[in-house]
Every structure is written in C-alpha cells, then in structure tokens.
Amino acid sequence: GGVGLALDRMNTIVDIDELNLQVTVEPGVITQVLQEAVAAKGLYYPPAPGSRGSCTIGGNLAENAGGPRAVKYGVTRDFVLNLEVVLPDGEVVWTGANTLKNATGYDLTRLIVGSEGTLGIITRAVLRLVPLPKETRLMLVPFRDERKACEAVAAVFRAGITPSALEFMERDAIDWTLRYVQGVSVSIADDTKAHLLVEVDGNHADVLMRDCETILGVMEQHDCQEVLFAETAAEKEGLWKLRRRVGEAVKSNSVYKEEDTVVPRHALPDLLAKVKEVGARYGFKSVCYGHAGDGNLHVNIIKGDLADTVWQHDLPKAIREIFTYTVSLGGTLSGEHGIGLVQRPYMDIAFSPVQLDLMRRIKNSFDPQGIMNPGKVLPYAPPGTLCQLELQIRP
C-alpha cells in the first residue's frame, strides 16, 4: 500500500512581484494560467511544455520541464529562485533565497528541481520572470531532405541568431497530426521530408525582420523549399498547433514507446540517422520531432504490425542501442521528460556505478525510509554498495 498526494487544489498564485520580476505560486497552478496571469502585467514566464494547458507548475518543477522556449530562455530550473519543501520526516524548509544571486552553501533548490518527487514535496515556489516580448515572428520551413533540415539548425546559431523556438518535425510527424487532429491544416509538397518551425521574439519589429532575413538565408543555403510566414495571430496559433499536437496524434492512435533523447545540436543529424537505422534493423517505424534548437529529439517508436513477442523482446535492445549512441555523441537519456520507472533500466548507460551510488547516497540522506516515490529514477544497487534504501524498497 501507499499514499498518493494530489496537490491540484493548491492552485493559488500567491503574489506577482512586478518590481523584482518574481512570482510566488503553489504547485497546483496550471502553467498556462500562470503565463496568462503574468502576461496581463507585461511579464513572461517562458518554460512551457506542449501540455502547458493542463500541466502544473509542481509537475514542471519535479521533471525540470523544458518546452520550445528553452533554446533561448532556459528550462524550469533556470527560473526557480526558492522552494518551500516538505521533507519525508515532516520538516518544512525553504531551499534558497528570493534573490538572483546566491553563493551561500549547497544549492538545494537546483537539487530538488528535477528530482521527480523522490526527495520531498514542493508546496510553494518563487519563480523568476522576464519582461514580455512585444513582437514575435514565426516561419515554417520545409525541406526535401531530413538531414539538411537538421544541419540547418546549428547553422542558424552560427549565423548569430538565437531563436525563441526552433522545432523539428519529420514528414511522418506532420502527417500524423493532419490525419488525426481536428482543425489543423497546412499545404505540404509531395517531396517534403521535414519541417523546421522557427520563432524569433523581441521588442523591435525591424530587428526581428533582419533576424528573419538572416534565418531565411541560412535555410536557403541548406536547400529549403518555399517558406511559410505566419502573418496573423491565428496563423501563428495554427502553426503552433501543428507542432504541439504531434504527440497527441501519435499517442492516441498507436501502441508506442516514446524516448526523449538530447544531444549537442550539431549532432542532431547523426542521431536522427541512427534512430532510422536501428528501426530498419529491428523492424519498427518511428515518428521523430522535438526541440531541435537545443538538440532535444522526441522519438516515438511505433509497434505497428510487430508481433507482441518481438515488440517485448527486441524493443529494449533497440532502445539501449539508441541511448548508447546518444551518450556517445555527448548527449543523455532525457532532456525534459525525466526517468521515472520506464527509463530506469538504462541509467547505467549515462552514469558510472560511482555516480549512481552517489545519487543513492543523496536519496538516502533525504529519505532514509524510502517513502518518497520508491523505486523511481535510480536502478537497484549491486551488492556491496550503499544499499539500505534499495533493500527497503526492493520488491
């Protein structure tokens, strides 16, 4: 047995501090609700997963969520100043200070963010805000070649531009969305293999236009097709809907396994090629899309017509190959979705036994009884290592 905590009723925006550009919230606040509340005061909270209309700040903190704007602004952890946390023994502590700078002691705040509920329960958060950009420009860039599209990503940054979003969608990703999601429409040439969705933001329209011209030049150097510029708010929302609903289209209409690989952005073309090569050998198809600007590629592996026995036996081997290659490129297992239970068997690919044992020691110092999300994140310890916690929660 166990106790499940639902914090969705702790949904108060406690204070919006316009002078210090901070907001204090409870964990049950919906991310989009927070964004809209601070936007009404000319402020901006950039971290926004695709599920921002339903996900909560507490969940974002637990996973260190990212989203499309991470490429320019950073992930959730980069916007957290201070946390109120209930520890497993019932003690209530604040982890930091409501300041932009803090060089005092160990950084407990950054340790709690992304810990997936294994160290404590977040009951309040002080988050950093930035001024709301006054202008945005958005373009959808098609390519006949997936590798060219991926190579264009790093080239944009080399040209001196930092987009507020730079998203990748292979042809299958868009086809799934157009097939299964109502109210999404875009014209796609028969020979188009991939798209980049590129957004820039700022306060001066003339500067953004120059940025768009630079980006367009980069795209043309990588043999893009005709670029679609979103001229109105409705057109922008339509293009974003096309990107945001890919995951929903795949997950609602297939048996799938999603990976959240992330690599240095220059390695994105090689990672995509490896995913397709592994799929061809094992007999599965994949739908790939994600936050290309920061190298975060979502890989949805589709069961399709594979027999259940093949799917269950071969899928873990295929995933291990993909993860091993990802790490060899300088990447890691998850950019923003976390580890939980499902990815736990692959942690040995990213971390040495010494690193994993260090993490277990941290877990044990916070939660010696192993009551906080037992069994999550860390694989079971081998004999001879710090194992008190693992012995307590081993099935």
Language-model segments: residues:
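FAD-binding subdomain of flavoenzyme oxidoreductases
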Residues: N11-E167, M372, Q388-P395
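Conserved, mostly hydrophobic/aromatic
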Residues: G117, V299, D367
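Glycine-rich loop at the start of a catalytic domain that most often binds anionic cofactors/ligands
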Residues: G1-L5, Y180
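Alpha-helix capping/hinge segments and adjacent helical runs
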Residues: V327-I339, K363-N364, P368-M372
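Short beta-alpha connecting loops at secondary-structure transitions
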Residues: E18-L21, M139, L306-D308, L341-D348
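C-terminal substrate-recognition/cap domain of FAD-linked oxidoreductases
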Residues: L127-P131, R137-P142, K148-E321, Y325, ...
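Activity-critical C-terminal alpha-helical subdomain
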Residues: E91, R344-P395
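Short coil/turn segments at secondary-structure boundaries
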Residues: P49-S51, F229-E231, P374-V377
